[in-house]
Amino acid sequence: TSGYASVLTNFTYAGGDRWTVTIPAKPSCTKVDFCIALDSTGDPWIKDGGDHSVTFPSDQKVIYASMKAGSEPEIAMPYNVGYEVDAEKQQVSYYYRDDAAFVDGTLKDMTVAVDVNGTEYPMTYNDATKRFEYVKSGLTDGKTYYRYKANGAYVVDAFNSNSEKHNNADYSYFEYYKLNATVTAEVMNKSFNYNENNVVKFKVEQDSSDAKTLEVASASIDVSSLGGSNAMPIEPELQAVTISATTDTTLGIKTLPITVTDQYGNKFSTTVDVEITDRVKENKKDFDWDEAVVYFMMTDRFFDGNESNNTASGADTYGDNPGLYHGGDFAGVTAKLDYLQDLGVNTIWITPIVENIKGVAVTDEGSKDVPYNAAYHGYWASDFTKLNPTLGTTGEFETMISEAHKRGMRIMVDIVVNHAGYGTESTFADMLRDKSVSEGDIKSWQSGLPDFATENADVRAKLVEWQTAWMMDYGVDYFRVDTVKHVDSTTWAALKNSTTKVNSSFKMIGEYFGAGYASNGSSLGTGQMDADLDFDFNDQATSFVSGNISSVEKFLSARNSALNNTYMTGQFLSSHDEDGFKAALMNGKKYTEDEATSAALVAATLQLTAKGIPVIYYGEEVGLSGLNNYPYQTNRYDMDFSKATKDNVTYQHYKNLLSIRNAYTDVFARGSRTVVASSDEEGYDVVSRSYGG
């Protein structure tokens, strides 16, 4: 993501317990992803924890981050900005940092002053923030002109685009106006329990005598009394946010402070009251969000319950070929609900249900024997308002959901908001961004797929409307949200608000690629996702079965402490986009099949006894596994139910573990994790999980 090829870069010893490394990044870069290799080979399996990332504004030239073993990187000095207005204290803080001087170590030796409206004030170097600083009291309405005098030379603020001539010299400037407004707030439901969400919205009424029109620059709500952040962001464009409460939040009335900041730094405050009530389950089959056990299937590869729809997307799209439809459908899921219930799962994640592009086309990205454009997986939508006819009818979809609900099971539908399918440019012409413009993770066509301009309010509203309709009209329980990192936070907050208004118990788990409990692009705890898929977990499981027990236990302990029902991750071992756990051991680490099977059983034990939402990939429970070897993708195999026998050790292992988890769901969903005894050398790990004791 730095804009350069992935390379192994060595650290330089900096004395004491400090090591440093310099990573080049191209000007458009806003994020650097990396992992810490534990040896010089660069083997991706031999690393300290999972993937890590540092995110920063695009105007920054130098980022200084620090990281301790077992934790995530943190920005170690403030971003380079020229000034900050504190309207409450009626003062301005001026800052100066020469990035080149910082890099070569001469910054603190400079002499710097700030010239404000023609008067110079000496600035003092602050070693903690790595910059020169000066605080000036007093704010007046209108423009304030300023520039810096660095080692005798005048320079304008490189991080402020506002500059003009003032007294025949070049100056930067900012504007300030004291505005007057009243903020009020209201909550969707006066009361809710820990398994529900709620929507809070605010309204700003400005004094008509103000010289300028107020614009909301930022807003936040203090939900610390609900177990959350003391400054949870509220998207200014929405002026509404979804909130939730942790399971240990005490019952009763909670007062939530809201702060709104305008474009000049003026702050306005209000509060809203909510009541936390007791959670009463409807019956023995009812379960909480953090008690979900998910079974993820590629619907097309699971079971063919209605052969008449197999060629509904075109006669050439169905066949015995990894790039074609294989016949799995809604009717097939319904037919196997008893199998899934007997296994011990309570939530079924199915791949996207909407109509996808039809036909087959071999392109440069495909191969002659594996057609590329048969959209059996569901991620290439052509119409977000219709069901994919190859998966079944509206009636079959409704039957699948109702039959699952009769068994106390819930349906999680995979949705795509980021993009449409290949060749749909004319269909969505007024909703797409310019393909020729590529700006980071969000404003780019990923893999050539038509990318929605979700930052456009009209585009966002239409996409949210389409997705909300599925859960509102058919009783879908949860969404699995594709490509979270490629869509702006405002859109995710809007979708969360919309679904919460329809069903306060509705939840969303996001696919923020590379996310873990400590690094998720601020998609958790911010009114966006209720959970993210945990991309760190299978790396940790691989490390665990390789003998690194103590380091993995440290990771699991930290993860256990961080997670709660409002901030969850879903641990998986295999998926449709990654190598299967067992196959990866055989292919990458050269395990025999028996060795890989034994290791996979250990990994499954780790997964199903850990805090978080277990996500079982279809077929994994009977020993199936494959590689993400595009275009063949043997990890997208056809489910083989003949392997689900009493003699199948893997199958019985999963059933036994799930039976235990379901019997003590509060312990596994919310309990503490304590290591009783473990040894890397002797290869054992004894852990205590407890709750309420």
How does the language model describe each region?
Residues 270-277:
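C-terminal edge beta-strand
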Residues 70-106, 168-179, 289:
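Basic K/R-rich, polyanion-interacting modules in nucleoproteins and related proteins
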Residues 83-88, 190-197:
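Short, solvent-exposed loop/linker segments at the N-terminal edge
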Residues 105-112, 465-572, 588, 596-597, ...:
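Active-site-proximal helices and loops of the catalytic beta/alpha 8
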Residues 263-269:
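Short, exposed coil/turn segments at beta-strand boundaries within extracellular/luminal domains
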Residues 30-34, 142-146, 252-256:
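Exposed beta-strand face motif in extracellular beta-rich ectodomains
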Residues 1-29, 38-56, 93-141, 149-175, ...:
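Aromatic-rich carbohydrate-binding modules that target alpha-glucans
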Residues 287-292, 300-474, 492-512, 517-520, ...:
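Substrate-binding/active-site clefts of carbohydrate-active enzymes
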